[in-house]
């Protein structure tokens, strides 16, 4: 953008206006690809049958509900310790803090036993936490360990920035997995800080070989792992810092055994779990772009199979399509209770205060749209 300077007779550039236009264009590239919500294809609608998620007979899979952060860390350490062939870890956020180093140490110990370890982390954490970090470099440099980053941050491709990997699970061999909302940080694992998220996870164990939902999860992981959006994270050079970090992580494991002696004992997995009829996992498309809302469609179909249903979520933001779906579900005869986090209980209160009007607006919109079957509760902690 140029203007004419009357004093000098020269043209000058109005950088402020130029920068403003550039910022607006960048924001447009960041948001416009996601403004128009995709519709669920007829192919997926025909493929998904909610009745296939149920069974009248007891299944092979057994489940446990993990709510305590220290117990969640112990489960990870024990599962990894017992692994003989393979460990798979997927997480949105992975920090090289105390809890994160505990998990790294366990993964390295497993790799030294010739267990194949694969770790995938979201690109935001890959950029903020892993880039150049000597502990993650040490992890990636270890034989039998592979690390990938899903959709790494690329400021030259803002249209990909909203596509994030929020999957959080641990799989060991073909017998068990842990899945839920816990990231691999002090906020979610162990008792290492003043502030903690009281989170929820499901542990699934199958005594008789690989279970149906475990096959689902492993197949899902393989698709994400092989995706072109998932990039390899490598240690380019084993510097002194990296070697010292590796030594620290290796020497950490005996201390973990002393700190968490239960992982040395034999665990009766059957006694720790309860019988289930059937476990089914649902997911959205995995590509780093605007996606068909397979999850929301599936959830609505499942809601309509019962008279009373509960949705537990840290927060909820509905578009017009979601309001219409909720109204339709309630008109089908289902009463829906939605439990969200209380904004005052959130560790990251600033973010959730921005979302609180959305939650209140959902209640008002449901009332305005006469969706009488929807009620709301606030959970007095932080759960995901």
Write out the residue ranges for each language-model feature.
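Lumenal/extracellular "mature" regions of secretory-pathway glycan-modifying transferases
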Residues: 148-150
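Charged, low-complexity intrinsically disordered terminal segments
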Residues: 2-145, 156-166, 172-384
């Amino acid at each position: 953008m140029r203007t004419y300077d009357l004093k000098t007779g020269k043209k000058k550039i109005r950088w402020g206006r130029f920068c403003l236009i550039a910022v607006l264009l960048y924001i447009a590239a960041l948001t416009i690809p996601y403004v128009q919500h995709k519709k669920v294809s007829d192919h997926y609608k025909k493929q998904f049958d909610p009745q296939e998620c149920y069974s009248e007979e007891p299944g092979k899979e057994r489940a446990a509900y993990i709510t305590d952060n220290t117990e969640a860390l112990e489960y990870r350490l024990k599962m990894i310790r017992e692994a003989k062939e393979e460990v798979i870890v997927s997480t949105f956020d992975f920090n090289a803090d105390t809890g994160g180093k505990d998990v790294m140490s366990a993964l390295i110990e497993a790799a030294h036993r010739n267990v194949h370890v694969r770790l995938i982390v979201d690109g935001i954490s890959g950029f903020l936490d892993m880039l150049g970090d000597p502990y993650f470099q040490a992890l990636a440099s270890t034989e039998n360990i592979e690390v990938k980053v899903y959709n790494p941050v690329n400021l030259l491709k803002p249209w990909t920035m909203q596509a994030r990997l929020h999957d959080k699970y641990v799989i060991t061999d073909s017998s068990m997995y842990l899945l839920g909302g816990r990231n691999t940080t002090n906020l979610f694992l162990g008792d290492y800080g003043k502030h903690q998220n009281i989170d929820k996870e499901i542990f699934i164990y199958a005594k008789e070989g690989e279970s149906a939902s475990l096959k689902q999860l492993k197949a899902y992981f393989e698709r994400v792992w092989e995706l072109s959006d998932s990039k390899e994270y490598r240690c380019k050079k084993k510097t002194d810092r990296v070697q010292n970090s590796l030594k620290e992580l290796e020497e950490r494991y005996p201390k973990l055994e002393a700190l968490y002696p239960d992982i040395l004992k034999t665990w009766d997995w059957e006694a720790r779990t309860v019988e289930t009829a059937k476990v089914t996992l649902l997911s959205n498309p995995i590509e780093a772009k605007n996606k068909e809302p397979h999850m929301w469609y599936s959830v609505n179909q499942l809601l309509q199979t019962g008279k009373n249903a509960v949705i537990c979520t840290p927060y909820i933001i509905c578009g017009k399509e979601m309001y219409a779906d909720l109204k339709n579900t309630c008109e089908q005869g289902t009463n829906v209770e939605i439990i969200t986090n209380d904004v005052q209980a959130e560790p990251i209160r600033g973010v959730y205060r921005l979302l609180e009007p959305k939650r209140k607006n959902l209640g008002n919109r449901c009332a305005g749209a006469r969706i009488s079957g929807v009620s709301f509760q606030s959970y007095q902690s932080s759960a995901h």
